């Protein structure tokens, strides 16, 4: 230890020691070359030029005793009288808190450009020749930093300099002793640094927080000639424009070479002030992979099917979230412009109705449509590693589009057809000063809530949203398996939307450039049968008037529309029948449980009701529950559900054939296909009516068995018709039959064909 004191005493008197310490270069980042370790003026870090003759190096040794453990500690202090501004203390306006000179620099990669050098002319340092082991040394600066000359700037400052690491270039035998940090009351301590200041806190007696900044441990011969000390704090995930705040438990940044530590210790009052000022600031986490990210990456590498499911879930999220953003734009139009029409008397009521007349209906429809999309796609928000590669809830987005297609066509067709007139009116409003100020005021309001900048960019949103629907559906179809039950609905809704867009596009003028549908639908290969028939170069071209007057194409278009309507109805009927069977089975189960409870109650009071009667009732309910649902399920699958599935496949193939055909299909073939589908559909409906009648007749017979004989005879005498008895037990039976008959009439193609 005496040898170490002598070596360091000789080093403290040597100016070359500080020059060597000042010019140690920052560690080279991974993937960089030596050219990146340029001179200090090119390096993106702060230089604090410290003259070699204005510091003193003092050594002290103390024993820290904690219980039975005694540890000898040695430290070296570099004393200086430099002063600066304490931003945190000044911000808190605490007159009792002195200003302590922060010394800091920032790693080069956290600055955008240039180096930052503090001038030597604004500061001067005094030399403290006292080398005794004291806890603090008070120095009075020879010159005030800046233009402020107040007595409270006199502040003690102490720089703790541990011993240098062993290195061939420095020949220093000491090793690096790490400075550990203490946790604060809330378990965290923060590193505070401004653009050019790094404030560290340390107190050996008061156990205050200590923050250390690493000094780079590499150097070059050229840089050893410079006289500067660079203090580099190297947090892993901070910005240079904000204060550097890091939790105390963050691992210290280490390099291959040993680094020295230059710590700034302040007094207890400033430590408390800074700790109080920084407790409300959020801590910045380090760069580390979370467990969820690691688990997700492992699952994606193990099971490739997860990637497809995750992509599909993200697309469904995109559809729902963009619909919410579109709804927000519609609300912005209504709030910023539509409801303020009465404030401007210069607006023509007819023009205002043309521009904003459809916004209310669009807003009402979009609110309901977004709610249905969110409920249908809710399962995509829970697609994670725990799901068995399927959505937790069914996603019937295609069916929702099919059910809303009529409203979409009715609302958006009129809105799109009036776009030319709407933009002409908006242009006219901006040319007049009275209406221009009203529009500009609305533009300022709307910019606070949306990304749009004016009325024109908001008016075009419905057209853009209509074009977005088929694009999103196409992406969802691409990641939906062929065997999925949702794929036919998605494909059909995509085709119907494309046809709707093509029909709207035919009414648009070519000169209409904003939100034009022309370029979009032409990029689609199957946008319309008429466009495909005329786009074939091998066939002679015909005009649109000739196509409209062609009776064969009109009939083909009508048959295509009828097939699509029938497909949607049959799809809904298939789902309804499955739900009906589940309801019937549940009803019999509930009936059996009720009778079982009554049997148990009768056993408690056998004198009121014979136990055998309740046992007979329970047995009858059990027979009905066990036999009737099984018989219904067999008949339902063989006579109804399977035929409906076959009809849906045939209709889908016919629709795709008509859309993809580049020639006019003969009317006789279409009539034959329509007749076959209609007969099969009628057969399915009649089978379902027969199953319902058989079920409720057996249901009624069972209840007649439970009714006493005298009451049974009176009921039969009054009704005189067994069908009325069935109707009495199940009123909804005949209502369902009437609805099915009306459904058959609406789907029938006999009158049209």
Swiss-Prot record:
Statement: the UniProt record of this protein carries the keyword Cell cycle: yes
SUPFAM superfamilies the UniProt entry points to: DBL homology domain (DH-domain)
Any one GO BP annotation for this protein: positive regulation of mitotic actomyosin contractile ring contraction
Pfam families, per database record: RhoGEF (PF00621)
Gene Ontology CC: cell cortex of cell tip; cell cortex of growing cell tip; cell division site; cell tip; cytoplasm; cytosol; division septum; endocytic patch
Subcellular location: Cytoplasm
InterPro entries: DBL_dom_sf (IPR035899), DH_dom (IPR000219), Dynamin-Rho_GEF (IPR051492)
DH domain mapped to chain residues: 311-507
Main localization, broad class: cytoplasm
Biased composition (Low complexity): 230-245
Superkingdom of origin organism: Eukaryota
MF terms (GO), sorted A to Z: guanyl-nucleotide exchange factor activity
Keyword vocabulary terms for this entry: Cell cycle, Cell division, Cytoplasm, Guanine-nucleotide releasing factor, Septation
Record-linked CDD domains: RhoGEF
Region (Disordered): 52-150, 175-194, 200-245
Matches recorded under Gene3D superfamilies: Dbl homology (DH) domain (1.20.900.10)
Composition bias type Polar residues, residue spans: 94-105, 114-141, 181-191, 200-220
Subunit structure of this chain's protein: Interacts with cdc42.
Role of this protein: Has a role in the control of cell polarity and cytokinesis. Involved in bipolar growth, via modulation of cdc42-shk1-orb6 signaling, and septum formation. Stimulates guanine nucleotide exchange of cdc42.
Protein name, per record: Rho guanine nucleotide exchange factor gef1
Organism whose genome encodes this protein: Schizosaccharomyces pombe (strain 972 / ATCC 24843)
């Amino acid at each position: 230890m005496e040898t170490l004191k002598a070596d360091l005493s000789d080093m403290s008197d040597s100016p070359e020691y500080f020059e060597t310490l000042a010019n140690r270069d920052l560690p080279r980042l991974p993937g960089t070359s030596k050219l990146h370790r340029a001179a200090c003026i090119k390096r993106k870090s702060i230089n604090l030029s410290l003259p070699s003759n204005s510091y003193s190096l003092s050594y002290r040794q103390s024993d820290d005793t904690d219980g039975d453990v005694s540890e000898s500690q040695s430290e070296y202090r570099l004393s200086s009288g430099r002063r600066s501004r304490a931003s945190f203390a000044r911000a808190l306006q605490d007159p009792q808190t002195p200003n302590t000179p922060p010394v800091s620099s920032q790693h080069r990669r956290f600055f955008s450009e240039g180096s930052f050098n503090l001038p030597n002319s604004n500061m001067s340092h005094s030399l403290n020749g006292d080398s005794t082991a004291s806890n603090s040394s008070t120095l009075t600066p020879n010159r005030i930093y800046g233009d402020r000359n107040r007595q409270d700037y006199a502040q003690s400052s102490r720089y703790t300099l541990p011993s240098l690491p062993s290195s061939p270039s420095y020949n220093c035998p000491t090793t690096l002793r790490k400075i550990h940090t203490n946790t604060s009351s809330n378990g965290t301590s923060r590193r505070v640094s401004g653009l050019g200041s790094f404030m560290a806190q340390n107190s050996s007696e008061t156990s205050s927080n200590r923050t250390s900044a690493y000094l780079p441990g590499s150097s070059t011969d050229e840089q050893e000639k410079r006289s500067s000390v660079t203090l580099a704090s190297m947090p892993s995930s901070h910005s240079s424009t904000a204060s550097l705040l890091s939790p105390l438990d963050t691992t210290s940044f280490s390099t291959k070479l040993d680094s020295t530590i230059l710590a700034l210790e302040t007094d207890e009052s400033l430590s408390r002030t800074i700790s109080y000022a920084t407790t409300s600031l959020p801590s910045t986490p380090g760069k580390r992979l979370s467990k969820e990210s690691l688990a997700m990456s492992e699952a994606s590498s193990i099971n490739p099917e997860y990637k497809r499911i995750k992509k599909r879930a993200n697309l469904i999220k995109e559809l729902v979230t963009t619909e919410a953003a579109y709804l927000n734009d519609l609300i912005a139009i209504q709030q910023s412009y539509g409801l303020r029409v009465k404030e401007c008397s210069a607006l023509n009521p007819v023009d205002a109705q043309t521009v904003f007349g459809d916004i209310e209906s669009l807003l009402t429809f979009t609110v309901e449509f977004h709610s249905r999309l969110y409920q249908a796609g809710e399962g995509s928000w829970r697609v994670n590693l725990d799901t068995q590669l399927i959505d937790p809830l069914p996603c019937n987005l295609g069916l929702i589009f099919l059910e809303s297609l009529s409203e979409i066509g009715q609302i958006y067709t009129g809105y799109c057809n009036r776009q030319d007139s709407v933009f002409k009116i908006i242009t006219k409003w901006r040319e007049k000063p009275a209406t221009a100020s009203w529009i500009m005021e609305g533009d300022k309001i709307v910019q606070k809530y949306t990304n749009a900048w004016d009325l024109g960019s908001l008016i075009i949103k419905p057209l853009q949203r209509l074009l977005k629907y088929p694009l999103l559906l196409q992406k969802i179809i691409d990641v939906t398996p062929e065997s999925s039950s949702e794929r036919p609905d998605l494909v059909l809704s995509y085709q119907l939307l494309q046809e709707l867009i093509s029909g709207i596009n035919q009414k648009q003028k070519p000169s209409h450039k904003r939100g034009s549908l022309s370029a979009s639908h032409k990029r689609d290969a199957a946008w319309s049968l008429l466009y495909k028939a005329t786009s074939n170069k091998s066939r002679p071209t015909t005009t649109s008037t000739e196509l409209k007057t062609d009776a064969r194409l009109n009939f083909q278009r009508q048959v295509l529309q009828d097939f699509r309507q029938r497909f949607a109805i049959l799809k809904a009927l298939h789902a309804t029948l499955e739900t009906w069977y589940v309801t019937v089975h549940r009803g019999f189960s509930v009936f059996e449980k009720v009778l079982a409870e009554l049997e148990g109650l009768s056993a408690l009071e056998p004198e009121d009701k014979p136990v055998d009667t309740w046992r007979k009732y329970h047995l009858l309910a059990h027979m009905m529950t066990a036999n009737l649902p099984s018989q219904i399920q067999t008949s339902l699958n063989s006579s109804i559900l399977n035929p409906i599935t076959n009809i849906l496949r045939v209709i889908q193939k016919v629709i795709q054939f008509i859309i993809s055909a580049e020639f006019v299909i003969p009317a006789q073939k279409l009539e034959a296909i329509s007749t076959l589908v209609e007969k099969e559909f009628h057969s399915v409906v009649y089978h379902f009516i027969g199953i319902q009648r058989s079920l409720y007749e057996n249901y009624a017979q069972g209840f007649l068995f439970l009714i006493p004989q005298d009451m049974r005879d009176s009921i039969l005498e009054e009704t005189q018709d067994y069908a009325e008895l069935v109707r009495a037990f199940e009123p909804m039976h005949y209502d369902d039959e009437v609805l099915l008959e009306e459904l058959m009439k609406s789907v029938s193609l006999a009158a049209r064909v």
